[in-house]
Amino acid sequence: MAQIKIYGIAERLVPVREALSDAIHSCVVEALQFPPDKRAHRFFPLDRANFFIPGGQGRTDRYTIIEISLFEGRTVEARKHLIRLLFERVQAAAQISPADLEITLTETPRHNWGFRGQSGDEIGLNYKVDV
């Protein structure tokens, strides 16, 4: 399971929302072997006044943050592969350069998740976590 949050300046984020979601999802499906129907993305388009962009490093008003919460268990290689794919595909799909993209992966134990009325470690999944 993964929950994905995407933050950016509204006038930059909203026009690319669909393409960005498709790019992110393709990365998760490939790198983490998620089923194609497992897409949980939430977009947070912010007013410029509510989104401070770190200076330097070539950042622009396209600066975007992707936060991915997921079950623990993926290998370091799988997580790094996901990050590499995100930098590549987000740039191609949404014209957000690697300098403008920040990615955070946060893993937690399955027992810290609750969905479908149960604790995450009690639910049978139709995909592997240990990739």
What are these regions (language model features)?
Residues 1-131:
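A domain-level signal for the structural core that forms small-molecule/cofactor-binding pockets
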